Amino acid sequence: MLAKRFEDILHKLGMAGLEHPLFYHAPVGIRFEIGGEEPIYLDRRAAKLKTNPAYVQGALDRAAAIYRALPAVPDLLRIDGYPDEEPAESLLTVIRQRMGLPVPDEQLPAIELDEDGDTHAQVQFYWDLSGITFQPEQLLQEIILGDIGGWSGFVSSVYLTGPGPFLYHLYDDRGLDVLGSSRELLLPLYHQFHGWILEYNLEQIDRVFTADQPQRRKFTIDGRRFSSMAGF
């Protein structure tokens, strides 16, 4: 069962279950900033806000670059829906139309407990990506648009996992969490995309990934953040 496989992956990531924000509930993870410097909307004074295509493309470029650099190609997709807001059949219709996905391999009703201790009906849809044609950039773009003119059902509800294991969670246009079963698994991502790590969490993430390594020296050029090993 894909649901059982997903649960096993969470345990291997050191998590008892899915609890948001995911980054703060996993021993090893990286939180990336996805939204760039471009304004989100073209004209905030307009009666109807219009999303800035340059902002969307910049966020998509970052999310897709990190996706392509994952330790392996994701082979399991989970999307959560909330039938209190829309019937499960309607949710699935919207998901399939927007993502170009087939009927899910598994569909599981569940109960979600939120941060306030309240319960909500949930339905979990699972796809085995190894057996279907999958367009990851279409998925990523729909998530990015979720809070800024798209369908909000994709916000904080889409999870991709793969061998390692790892979990890739683009939660909205602002950020992305990648969790791993070990520091070594995510070390290439840490080095390659260090300049995109969310500054608020940078010190914490640096401590995890440089625990047994020479101290990194941080510097800024033209507003962009860089780092190098001390002594070089």
Task: Tell where the protein language model's regions lie, with residue ranges.
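Extended, low-hydrophobicity segments enriched in charged/polar residues
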Residues: 1-150
